[in-house]
């Protein structure tokens, strides 16, 4: 995905359910000012992935509701395309996603949209609570849009399954990254994985640190931005989804998400590694 410094570049025109036709390529992270501008111009679909009852209380203006649990229930390529169509999202339409869970749910949804071919997807730089605490606009209107058409173009290059992960250990240039908290990682993890706790990649109300900070952080872990990196977490790819976008933001070109993560790995009886004699310093993520 082409990244620019909060610079949203115009690409082309297309249909967008009666809204402004100008489509723009979004950066990985969309800040509040940029999103407010896009909302005013009616050139974006905002997606709220919190629980339905939270959305009904209030939300970012024009946002549609996609509770994260609903996405998991339809988590196949065809099912996700149906969701995009139901939300009135067409190919190339700019989509900005937010949550109230430090960006983890939004990241998993954004990655899923990209996996089925909707590449013009960004994460809101902040959570909804932070948006509200800054005094930014909210509304209670339940937003719906006419059902759209959307093509299916699965991007296998950003996904890893258990077999791929298992074979990765034979390739030194492929690095596994466990995004869980340090103690969970030390208790047990996929052999050879490095730990980048999700708690270390956000900062100052933002769901992700800036690109240079993330790059420095991963390099301190002995991870090269030239490597192929596979992220995973404990269950359904939320924490590792956030790590996925942190790595992309830092300039890592080849990142994959093992979306079924450690829960599937254990259920398949795959090998695990642990630190039986971990001490206080082992718990430090720095």
Q: What kind of feature is each model-predicted range?
A:
Residues 205-207, 268-269:
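Short conserved micro-motifs at the rims of enzyme active sites and ligand-binding pockets
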Residues 18-31, 128-187, 194, 269-286:
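Active-site neighborhoods of enzymes that stabilize oxyanions during catalysis
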Residues 2-6, 13-26, 71-163, 224, ...:
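Thiolate-centered catalytic microenvironments shared by cysteine-dependent enzyme domains
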Residues 38-41, 88-89, 168-171:
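Flexible, charged surface loops at secondary-structure boundaries
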Residues 41, 60, 118, 171, ...:
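Short, well-ordered coil/turn elements that cap or connect secondary structure elements
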Residues 59-62, 110-112, 137, 189-192, ...:
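Short, glycine/charged-enriched secondary-structure capping and boundary segments
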Residues 210-223:
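A short, acidic, amphipathic alpha-helical segment used as a generic capping/interface helix at domain edges
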Residues 22-75, 79, 94, 174-185, ...:
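N-terminal intrinsically disordered, low-complexity segments enriched in P/E/S/T
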């Amino acid at each position: 995905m082409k990244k620019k410094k909060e610079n949203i570049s115009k690409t082309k025109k297309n249909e967008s359910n009666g809204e402004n036709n100008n489509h723009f390529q979004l950066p990985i992270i969309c800040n509040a000012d940029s999103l407010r501008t896009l909302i005013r111009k009616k050139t974006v679909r905002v997606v709220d992935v919190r629980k339905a009852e939270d959305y009904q209380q209030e939300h970012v203006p024009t946002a549609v509701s996609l509770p994260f649990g609903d996405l998991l229930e339809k988590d196949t390529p065809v099912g996700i395309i149906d969701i995009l169509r139901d939300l009135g999202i067409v190919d190339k339409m700019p989509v900005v996603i937010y949550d109230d869970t430090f960006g983890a749910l939004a990241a998993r949804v954004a990655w899923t949209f990209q996996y089925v071919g909707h590449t013009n997807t960004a994460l809101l730089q902040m959570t909804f609570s932070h948006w509200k605490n800054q005094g930014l606009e909210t509304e209670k209107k339940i937003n719906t849009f006419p059902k759209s058409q959307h093509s299916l173009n699965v991007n296998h290059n950003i996904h890893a399954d258990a077999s791929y992960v298992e074979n990765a250990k034979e390739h030194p240039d492929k690095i596994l990254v466990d995004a869980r908290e340090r103690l969970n990682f030390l208790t047990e993890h996929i052999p050879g994985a490095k730990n980048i706790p999700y708690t270390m990649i956000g900062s100052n109300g933002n769901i992700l640190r800036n690109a240079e900070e993330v790059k420095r952080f991963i390099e301190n872990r002995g991870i090269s931005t030239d490597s192929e990196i596979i992220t995973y977490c404990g269950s359904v790819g939320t924490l590792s989804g956030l790590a996925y976008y942190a790595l992309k933001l830092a300039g890592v070109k080849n990142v994959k998400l093992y979306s079924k993560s450690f829960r599937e790995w254990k259920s398949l009886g795959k090998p695990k590694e642990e630190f039986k004699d971990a001490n206080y310093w082992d718990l430090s993520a720095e």
